[in-house]
Amino acid sequence: MPLKPISFRWSKTSVRSVPNPFMYGPDNLNKPLSRASQMAERVHQQTPSSTNYQQRRYFSYYYYQFPKIPRPKRNMLYYSTWSRNPVTNASNANKPSKRHMLPFGSFKISKRSFANANQKLKTKLKKLKMGKERRRFIRWWTVTSLTIVLGGVYAKIKYERGDHEENPYKIRPQSWHLYAYSALPLKTISRLWGQVNSINLPVWIRSPSYRVYSAIFGVNLDEMENPDLSSYKNLSEFFYRDIKPDARPIADGDLVSPADGKVLKFGVVENGEIEQVKGMTYSIDALLGIDTGKLAAPTHSLNFDYNSDDETIVKRDEEFAKINGISYSMDDLVGGNSKSTYHMNELTYKDEHDGTAAGERASFSKELRVAEELTPNPVEYFRKKNLYFAVIYLAPGDYHHFHSPTSWVTTLRRHFIGELFSVAPFFQKTLQGLFVLNERVALLGYWKYGFFSMVPVGATNVGSIVVNFDKDLKTNDIYEHEVYSSASSVNESTPLLDQKDYSANDILTITNSEYEDKKRKKLRKNTVYEATYTNASRLLGGYPLSKGQDIGGFKLGSTVVLVFEAPENFKFNLKVGEKVKVGQSLGGFV
């Protein structure tokens, strides 16, 4: 019995419930395409939004959306590269291996690679990994190289400055304000300030500028030797102005003030320490350089414009010694005749084939060595005498010259290369060893009671320290003086007083062409440059200075420190904070 074809009735309301017409085959096998077209058209009418989307997407009127084959999303870590450590032997199954005792010790890299991964993805990951490793290597190499280079540069600068040596008075600020201040290039700033002060001002602006400065810092214009303010070309000349001779009368006492300023501290040196402020001290050895074992250049004897062997000069020195009670035979320095007594003109030496023996007359190097041995340690020879000190601060408005505080003989000059911190009272209370750290010039010698020294100390914006009779002294500079650069080579083990004397005449005989070939050395911090004044007087062994005599000065305000030996009955007639002037009595004997 033949089967009847199954027919379906279509309606808009029953489209979704009618089964697929092709499930059991088409009604008319002769028209399969028309039937399929009708079904496709009906499906297309039921989904107008998708049709419009496809038309907009593919710019066509009709598009048949073929079914997509679903592809599972594969995880890249599906095939793990880590696998458990297999048990190779049944007998070792219960024994933990060494891998299990370590972190991730039970894992190992599998031989199976990402064989099913996309080759392009593998290449991309490989390039990313190589780029990351390259950047990591570059960063490591760059940082390491820069660290080594900068460390070497810092070490070189530190060595040239002399910071490689341990300084017990090194600034260790307790606050970031002082640390930032100590890190400033104060020497460079001071040099620039000195150059600015040396710029000549127009005539019309000189007088108003100097009057404004005088009003700010309290300068007394009435005592100026030259009252015409327009005659001072620049600020430097105005700072270093002269005053009338009768403006500073000299007192009759044994010791007078060397400068105008405020008394910061005075007293007796105890245990070789000078009190800066209460609870803060610094060593006298560090201030004067008594124990300095090496110099930046050989010691040389300064030459003067006159002949010390001239009969007039000898008589002048004899009269100076008699008036001021100074013995040129060094008897007063050692307390009479004993095994330790040496007379400057009576020293004899054995010829030890070192070139120092010169018959009956002593060489200057031997005389200086004896003087350096005896003079800095006078307490050993003067049991009834003390070492005293006084510190006087010069403000920017004060008279900037310093004078001789007594009649004495200076035999040695030591120029200490250091910092240029401010010496204002605030920093003296804050920075320990301030006067030891700063650049200074120590004039050492003797007076009728024993050892005597005067130390002008530099400060911030102090262009230079001037000593009138020392033409080779140049402070706050970058390079050392030509005298030291022209001398023979010297190493760090050079003793304080060399076996050989270097006179300025011998050194300056080098021609200009030879000197130009020699490169000037830069000044190194914490080093000393030394000169002797023995050529000033064969009789006194140094340069004689009378009480009240103008010695030199500062280009701006600073500090003067006196360290001297005197009997126990010497008393200061001062008060801390008192204002003193040149020639005013500092103390006397009671």
UniProtKB/Swiss-Prot annotation:
Q: State which ranges are Mitochondrial matrix (membrane side).
A: 60-140
* Stretches that traverse the bilayer: 141-159
Alphabetized, the UniProt keywords read: Decarboxylase, Lipid biosynthesis, Lipid metabolism, Lyase, Membrane, Mitochondrion, Mitochondrion inner membrane, Phospholipid biosynthesis, Phospholipid metabolism, Pyruvate, Transit peptide, Transmembrane, Transmembrane helix, Zymogen
List, separated by semicolons, the cofactors it needs. pyruvate
Q: What happens when the gene is disrupted?
A: A psd1 psd2 double mutant displays diminished phosphatidylethanolamine levels. It exhibits defects in cell wall integrity, mitochondrial function, filamentous growth and is less virulent than the wild-type.
Identify the catalytic residues. Answer: D260, H403, S558
Q: Which NCBIfam families match?
A: PS_decarb
**Annotated protein name in UniProt:** Phosphatidylserine decarboxylase proenzyme 1, mitochondrial
State the organism named in the record.
Answer: Candida albicans (strain SC5314 / ATCC MYA-2876) (Yeast)
**What gene is behind this protein?**
PSD1
